[in-house]
């Protein structure tokens, strides 16, 4: 029962973003605005201010969060029925690592059990990306060093 309520709340948070659509930065920031209780009708902030707020709240930039979502989908490690708001909960959890009650309040008043479930599913999914992300990084670093020494 609690899971269904949380799912409906996330669907409300993501009313513009389809689960099957590619999550863009605009879709991620719209979900973040809903979590912050800044709906569509509220005053629009400058992009730099909004990115700073996003970094302070979730621990990474908007482009990084969007890229994480895309890589989770591409590598097929996105938790089943996972939504963008769940990813943001996980990022917030890793950034703040606070008491569950406080995190649930910040996440829009969700149930503790639901928050814990989705936050940990996404933390584990992000951790599972380490081998592919780190190996790609090291490969490009190797190529960069190789070509800079040739030139």
Segments predicted by a language model, with ranges:
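Short, amphipathic alpha-helical "recognition" segments used to contact nucleic acids or chromatin
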Residues: 83-96
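Alpha-helical interaction elements in eukaryotic regulators
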Residues: 61-64, 85, 99, 115-118
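Short amphipathic alpha-helical segments enriched in hydrophobics
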Residues: 72-76, 97, 126, 130
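Short amphipathic alpha-helical segments embedded in low-complexity Lys/Glu-rich regions
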Residues: 81-82, 135
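Short, basic interhelical loop/turn and adjoining N-cap
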Residues: 105-118
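Short, charged amphipathic recognition helices of the HTH superfamily
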Residues: 95-107
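Active-site- or DNA-interface-adjacent structural scaffold in DNA-acting proteins
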Residues: 116-151
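Charged, often Cys/His-bearing segments associated with DNA-binding zinc-finger transcription factors
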Residues: 1-78
């Amino acid at each position: 029962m609690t899971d269904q309520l949380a799912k409906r709340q996330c669907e409300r948070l993501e009313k513009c973003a389809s689960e099957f659509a590619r999550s863009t930065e605009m879709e991620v920031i719209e979900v973040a605005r809903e979590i912050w209780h800044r709906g569509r009708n509220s005053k629009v902030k400058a992009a730099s201010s909004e990115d700073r707020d996003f970094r302070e709240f979730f621990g990474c930039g908007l482009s990084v969060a969007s890229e994480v979502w895309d890589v989770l989908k591409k590598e097929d490690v996105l938790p089943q029925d996972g939504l963008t708001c769940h990813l943001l909960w996980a990022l917030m959890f890793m950034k703040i690592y606070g008491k569950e009650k406080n995190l649930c309040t910040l996440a829009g008043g969700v149930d503790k059990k639901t928050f814990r479930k989705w936050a940990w599913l996404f933390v584990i999914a992000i951790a599972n990306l380490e081998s592919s992300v780190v190996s790609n990084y090291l490969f490009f670093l190797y190529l960069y060093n190789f070509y800079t020494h040739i030139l």
